[in-house]
Amino acid sequence: MKRQKRIALVNDITGFGRCSVTVELPLISAMKIQACPLPTAILSVHTGFPNHYLDDYTARMEPYIKSWEVNGLAFDGICTGFLGSAEQIAIVLDFIHRFKGAETRVMVDPVMGDYGKLYPSYTQEMCDKMRRLLGVADLVTPNLTEACQLLDIPYPEDGIVTDGVLQQMAEALAARGPQQVVITGLHEGDFIKNFLYDAGHMAIVRAPKIGGDRSGSGDAFAAIVAASLINGEGLEEAVQKAASFISRCLQYALELDLPWNYGLPFEEYLTELH
């Protein structure tokens, strides 16, 4: 009997600011896949606002997972986003071991930092545990900062690396577990570049730079790539689809003069995503 595909989303739920699950769920649903949130926290707005309310969900994650297990749920994909503590990473590792079937794809977006710096909440223990998460991943989508941290190598002073170095980094990340690696958000003149490694094959997907940084862009990218892969598309096609969709949203955000922390106005183009 035919069954609709499902992806478990391990991420926070944020009420305003278009990030994490509130971006991932509608995008994945538009691509005809059931999105099933496993919340790590509930926030009123993301931390890019002057004030936010946060309800840490760590203590509730295990009984939540246990209920899924007792009910016999299974997933075609598991996507992980921002994890707020070493304990949460350990819980997610256990969740993957319990729910990763023979055909389940695990996609890890290691949200750790940017522009050469870790986020303030990130500890050395969290970095070590995130490296362990690589060992159970099929796909990992770090930016340059995160790739350097995962490999324990220095971040380049100007944030620029050659394609040869990117290839070495992608191969080194793949050697730790994932067959597929996308090093995201690389600056190259008037373009943003994504460097792809797919079981030995390399490719580059570029998109024009449009505006500045915008909350939730990484979540949107990860969601579209994940859903595309679960739908049977290749990695390069998936990344191109994500980059093109996000470019349209960024352009529309400029037209609306939308503050960066309001995220991507993806709703305008949601019905065109498939």
Functional labels for PLM-detected ranges:
Residues 2-108, 112-120, 271:
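Conserved N-terminal subdomain of the carbohydrate kinase-like
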Residues 15, 202-216:
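Short pre-catalytic strand/loop immediately N-terminal to key active-site residues, enriched for Gly-Thr
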Residues 149, 212-235, 239:
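Short, small-residue alpha-helix embedded
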Residues 236-274:
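Charged C-terminal helix
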Residues 60-63, 132, 168, 237-245:
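A non-catalytic, amphipathic alpha-helix used as a structural packing/dimerization or gating element
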Residues 120-202:
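Conserved phosphate/ATP/ADP-binding segment of small-molecule kinases
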